[in-house]
Amino acid sequence: MGRRAFLLLLFFLMLTAALPASASGWRSLPLWGGDVRSLAIHPDDPDMVFAGTSAGQLYLSRDAGRSWSDAGAHLPFPGWVVGTLRFDPNKAGRLWVGLWGIWGGGQVAFSDDLGKSWVSRVSGLPEEPIYTMALVPGRAGRIYVGTLSGVWGTEDSGESWRRLTGELPDAQKVTSLLVDANQPDTVLAGTWRRAYRSDDGGRTWTGIFEGMVLDSEVFSLTPVPGRPGEIWATTCGWVYRSPDLGGKWERFKEGFEERRTPSFSALPDGRLLAGTVAGLHVSTDGGLTWKRTGDPALSIQGIYWHPKRPERIYLATEGSGVWVSSDSAATFRPSSDGMTNTRVSALASFGEELMVALSHAGPVSGIHISRDRGKTFEAAGFTPLPTVLDLTWHEGRIYAATERGLYERRGAAWFRLNELGETRVEQVLGEGPQLVARTATGLWELRGTKFVQRPFQHGTPRSAAFFGGALWVTDGSGLYRLTATSNDTVATPFAGGRLHRLQDQLLLWGPGGAWTRPALETEWIELTDKASRLLPTGHERWSSLMVSGDTVRLYDRDSRKFRIVDVPVPARDISAALVLGGKLMLGTSGHGVLVHDLGEELFPASAAPAPVAAGTGG
C-alpha cells in the first residue's frame, strides 16, 4: 500500500471511528480554551460559528461563541491541524476544511450536514500540507488550495486537481490565497517569499514583488470593503498595502510592538485590525499608525466578522481559545466555554486542592486550582506562571518546576527562588528532609533555606528518583546511584532511559521499553520491549500509568499488574496522570483533563493484564 493510499485509509477511519469521549465513560474537566487555527461563520446565520483546532477538533457554537460543543465526532481529525474552514459560496450549507498533518501530508474534505460527516476530496493532490483554501463566488466547483509545492486547483469540487504553478519553482509554501470579488479569474497567492498573481484563473502567474522585502512570508491577503483593488498583506515583517491588487506594495509598521502578523481584517467603518503573535493592533488612519489594544499575550491567528453583524468580531488565538468583541473591537472577552483543546503540563493534588497546570495558553497559562476535585475552577484560584513541568509537596510547601525557574508557593502566591534564576527546571522531587531540583544542566539540592548546586560529574541529567536511600540519576548514556559518600555507575538494559519509582521498585523507561528493578535486586526485568513512558499518579494502589505506543496501562498494586485502559484520545497526547477521589484523571496535550471513574468498566474485558515483578510492596 502506497503512502497516499495509507493516508486516505487512515483519514476515512478517523472520520468513521471517532467517538465522543462520553461514549466510553470519559468526561472533561471545565478548563476551557483551545489552540484555534480557523473559524467560519455561517453565511445565513451570524450566530453560528465553527472553530477548528490544532489537535483535530471541530467545535460549533449556535450562540455567537458564548458556548461550544462538538460539531460531530468528538475528535474528527486526530493528528491533523484544522488550518482552514470555508463555507462554499456556490453550495448552500457546504463547509470545506483544509488540514495539514502533524507528521506531514494534508487533506481536503467537505461536509453538507454542519460537520457531522465528511467527504474527502484529495484525488490528484500531493501528500503535502494544505495551508490555505479559496473558493470562487459564481464559479461553482472552482477551488484553489495552497500547499508546499504551490497552488493547486479544481474545477469539479475536488474530484480532480492539477498543479497551477508548475512553471514557477519559487512559488512554494503557499500560505494565503485571495480571489478578487470583482474579477473571479484574478487570484493572488502569498508564499514563503512574497506573492504572485494570476489574471486567467491560474493558468499563468506573475510575481508581484515591487515594494515588498524579498524574504517576506505572506501569511494573509485581505481586501478592503468598498475599495476595489485595495488589499493588505500580512507578513513576518509587519503589513503591506497595495492599491492595485499587488501591482505595488507599501510597508507600514509605525506603532507595531511585534512584527510577525498572521492575520488582518478591514472593517466596514474604515478601521484596520492586525493580529500579531503579541496582541491585536488597530489603525484608524488607513494604516499610517497602529496601536496595540487588549492583552499582549494573545497570539492571533485569525480575525472574523459577519456582514450582518460587523460590530461582533471573533479572534482565533493560539492556545487561548476564541475571544469575542461585541463593540467593534473596543473590548474583547474570552469565549471558549465547552472547548477542551487545552495543553496540560502537570497535575497534582495537595490537601483539598487539585492543581492543573496549563501551558501555551497565553494569558491563562499557569496553575488553575479546584477545591471540589475538578467540578469548578475559580478565577481567584488561577496563578500565571511559565510552563510548569513538575509539581511536588515537601515539608508543608509546594514547589513548581517551570521553564523559567523554580517557584515556591507561600500562602496563595508563588515566588521564584533566586538561586536557580530563570533556568529551565525539569523536575523537583523530595524524600524525607531531602529536596532536589533537576535542571537542563545539573542538580540542585535544598540546604537549610537555600538551594545549592549538587556535584554531578556525568552528562546532562535526564531523570532522577529517590530509591533505597540513594538518589538515582540517568543521563544520555548511563545510570548512576548517588549517596553522600558514593557515586556508582549501574548497568542498564539500554541507554538514554528515564526513571520512575514504583513503591519498592525502580522503573526504567524510554526507547528500549520499560524495565523494573525490585528492591535488593541487581537484575532488570523487562515489562515491555516497546518504547514507553511512565507517569506517576500520586495514588498508593493505582500508582503509575504506562504508555507504550498506542497502548495505555494503569498499574494495580493489589494484583501487581499493569491493566490496559481504553482512552478516547491518541495515547501520545497523554502528558500527566492523577488518581483522586476514586477517579483517574489524564492531563493531555490538546484535549484538556479527561476523567473516568475507577472501576472494571475502565478496563476492556478482553485485555490481559501485564505482570510486574513481585516485591515485598509490589
Region spans (language model):
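Bacterial N-terminal signal peptides that target proteins for export
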Residues: 1-8
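Extracellular glycan-interacting surfaces
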Residues: 9-15, 20-618
